[in-house]
Amino acid sequence: MNRSSFDLLSTVEYGGCSAKLDPAKLSELLHDIPLPVDSRIMVDVSTHDDAGVYRLNDDTALIVTTDFFPPVCSDPYTFGRIAAANALSDVYAMGGRPLLVLNLTMFPSEGIPVEVLADILRGGQQTIDESGAFTMGGHTIDDPIPKYGLAVTGIVHPEHLVTNAGVRAGQCLVLTKPLGIGVAMAAHRLGLIGSEVYEAAIGQMCLLNRAGAELMQKYGIRGATDITGFGLLGHAKELAEASDVCLHIDSRSVPVLPECLSLLRDGCIPGATFRNLRFVGDMLRADCPTEYKMLLADAQTSGGLLMAVDADRAEDLVADLHRTGLHPFAAIIGYATDAEDAAKLIVT
């Protein structure tokens, strides 16, 4: 089947997870919104987790989440794949298995061929099929700027749930995918990188976090998150706050896409990076080169899992991630200690 050659990037200024609302503004907005109270609700928005969780019975809990955004790449089919992988990731980050999805689509009734929308949906369906979930329908509205994503329902055993609040002092931090997605995509739009770096970024965004979720269960991991629009620092902040720990990150151990550090040194810094640095604010104590600090705040789209694993099992976890053939970049990037002062993130 022929695929559309329409360039989706011509329709947007900000794409992917870099289009998220400023996290500081979002926190302020949600502050006065009343939370539901029910003994069956295991996770709500108070801990800024990746999804909500509702206990059905002693053996099953529902994971519910949604995610959508404007195009992050030119090709409609690839955009569909990335957006679906990003939405499904929230379920994986909670240690669950995606079960049912609904397509969420915003698309103009005029100006862009309808075949483009068909390609987006086909790309999304490829990734949904890879996850083992089932598409049950969706909703589409007329919007001048295309957007696509999913509402996802997953399941998890209540005793195997992974949350932001599950990190313990003494554990090591493992990251499954490289950083630099935001930098690479900005550089691509400016013509600063070749196809090799661009395709590497695309490949990471299309990759499901399924293998990482399965290994979290094998290793008994209970504290983790996925790294998306708030960058590694922003999501690590949410882990640290919910778990009441301090996270120590070795910036030079963090995996990074090719050329991204040199791009940052040369000033290719997406605007979302500064937004994310404002979000972590005084909780960050950084003693590292500027380009590494910027890398850690880079907004990721469909990024990897940041897991907290017992120190004596961290190297085995990384080896297992490598053996999947899907996560060659996986690495130990730091550790957790008891929180002692306002600094929840210490970067060296």
From Swiss-Prot:
Keywords: ATP-binding, Kinase, Magnesium, Metal-binding, Nucleotide-binding, Selenium, Transferase. It is an enzyme of class 2 (transferase). ATP binds at K20, T47, H48, D49, D67, D90, G138, H139, T140. Its EC number is 2.7.9.3. Binds 1 Mg(2+) ion per monomer. It catalyses: hydrogenselenide + ATP + H2O = selenophosphate + AMP + phosphate + 2 H(+). CDD domains: SelD. Its cofactor is Mg(2+). Mg(2+) binds at D50, D90, D226. GO terms for cellular component: cytoplasm. The record marks K20 as: Important for catalytic activity. The active site is at C17. One of its GO terms (molecular function) is selenide, water dikinase activity. The keyword Metal-binding applies. InterPro entries: PurM-like_C_dom (IPR010918), PurM-like_C_sf (IPR036676), PurM-like_N (IPR016188), PurM-like_N_sf (IPR036921), SelD_I (IPR023061), SPS/SelD (IPR004536). It comes from the Bacteria. GO terms for biological process: selenocysteine biosynthetic process. Homodimer. Synthesizes selenophosphate from selenide and ATP. PANTHER family: INACTIVE SELENIDE, WATER DIKINASE-LIKE PROTEIN-RELATED, SELENIDE, WATER DIKINASE. Belongs to the selenophosphate synthase 1 family. Class I subfamily. NCBIfam families: PRK00943.1, selD. This is Selenide, water dikinase. It comes from Porphyromonas gingivalis (strain ATCC 33277 / DSM 20709 / CIP 103683 / JCM 12257 / NCTC 11834 / 2561).
